[in-house]
Design a protein with these regions (language model features):
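Short, aromatic- and cysteine-enriched interfacial helices/patches
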Residues: 2-5, 33-35
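N-terminal Sec-pathway targeting helices
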Residues: 3-19
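Intrinsic-disorder-associated interaction segments
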Residues: 4-8, 25, 46
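Eukaryotic scaffold repeat domains enriched in small/polar residues
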Residues: 30-358
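Bacterial N-terminal signal peptides
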Residues: 17-27
Length: 358
């Protein structure tokens, strides 16, 4: 400061400078903090989930380890994999890496026989429940394929009857069945006694047009997908409607029809298999926010995105590409198993940049 200023004047000037600086910092700091918070959101929660191809198994045929129209894939507590085939009317059991172990089932209506086996549910005691669609029943087996019991008293709409059921899920909140032909969801207790039901045919929040895909999150909320209406409806475990999300289209977060299957992982991420015209698996949070997808497109008409492994001849779908995918399941490590029905195979994908699903 200039030497001719008095001590009092110097103090006044210093006080003015410090006060001005303090006010400036007060005005600027919130904007700095907001910028940091936004950056954290952009690089963290909003990052898209990504998966890498791991392995595949299966081919077209009727022998062990082969499929014609594979439909569902499920796991028991030891990691064994079970696949239903709705054309061969059987269930096949594999190791977690895809090595064939055994198969059971044949066409018919007797115990242990199937007419279009659809979904597979496995309870906490490793009992296998198969939705036997055209026999309008659910059959129960042990892990060796030995028949134990069945539920369903013929085709109908009474409480002890089913009409072309298509999905089943076990949860701490109950056992839920998509009774597709009756346009309703059934809830059973652990003894398979009916405790609740909801839905009727029609368009609306509490009505269904052939509900055929269901799963349950950690809070007991039930997610329902329909054959002829795009999007997902969400209910509490007692059937109270909560919300719906999704619309028709081919963009991220949109669906083509039919939506084939719904699966919820241990982090409450919702995986939805899109329709045959847009074959992919999309991933959402519980509010319908798009998080990522699995599956790369192949346009057979132009060859864009397809492979030609043997020179002249038909184009093929490579690893990570699907033809008419039908079901998806997530194991305890977060690996995603996709039933690639049109290619008669199972494809497995591992999480890359994602949080652990444990």
């Amino acid at each position: 400061m200039a030497p001719w200023l008095t001590r009092v004047e110097k103090i006044r000037i210093l006080f003015f400078v410090l006060t001005t600086l303090a006010i400036s910092l007060f005005l600027v700091m919130p904007h700095i903090a907001i910028g940091i918070e936004s950056l954290q959101k952009d690089t963290g929660k909003d990052a898209k989930l990504k998966f890498s191809f791991v392995r595949k198994w299966g081919s077209n045929g009727t022998g062990p380890g082969q499929f014609v129209r594979p439909h569902d894939v499920a796991f028991d507590s030891k990691g064994f994999v079970y696949v239903s085939d709705r054309e061969l009317d059987n269930i096949q059991k594999f190791t977690h890496n895809g090595t064939f172990i055994k198969m059971w089932g044949s066409e018919g209506s007797g115990n242990g026989q199937f007419r279009v086996p659809y979904s597979i549910g496995i309870d906490s005691k490793d009992k296998i429940y198969v939705v036997d669609r055209e026999n309008h029943r659910i059959q129960k087996f042990d892990t060796n394929g030995t028949f134990i019991a069945k539920a369903g008293n013929g085709r109908g709409s009474s409480d002890n009857q089913l009409d072309r059921p298509e999905d089943i899920v076990f949860s701490p909140f109950g056992i839920f069945v998509a009774d597709t032909g009756n346009d309703r969801i059934l809830k059973f207790n652990s003894n398979f006694t009916l405790v609740n039901k909801w839905g009727s045919k029609g368009i609306g929040d509490e009505k269904f047009i052939h509900p055929h895909a269901i799963d349950v999150d950690s809070k007991g909320n039930v997610y329902v997908g329909e054959l002829n209406e795009p999007g997902v409806k969400v209910f509490d475990s007692n059937g109270k409607f909560l919300k719906r999300w999704g619309s028709n289209g081919t963009g991220d977060g949109e669906f083509s029809l039919p939506q084939e299957h719904i699966a919820v992982d241990s982090k409450d991420r919702v995986y939805i298999v899109d329709g045959a015209s847009n074959p992919r698996v999309q991933i959402f949070d519980t509010n319908g926010k798009f998080l990522g997808k699995i599956g790369t497109p192949c346009k057979m008409s132009t060859g864009e995105g397809c492979i030609d492994s043997d020179g002249p001849g038909p184009l093929e779908l490579g690893d990570g590409q699907f033809s008419k995918p039908e079901h998806v399941s997530i194991d305890t490590e977060g690996n995603v198993f996709v039933v690639d029905r049109g290619n008669q195979r199972i494809q497995v994908f591992a999480p890359m940049n994602n949080e652990s699903t444990k």
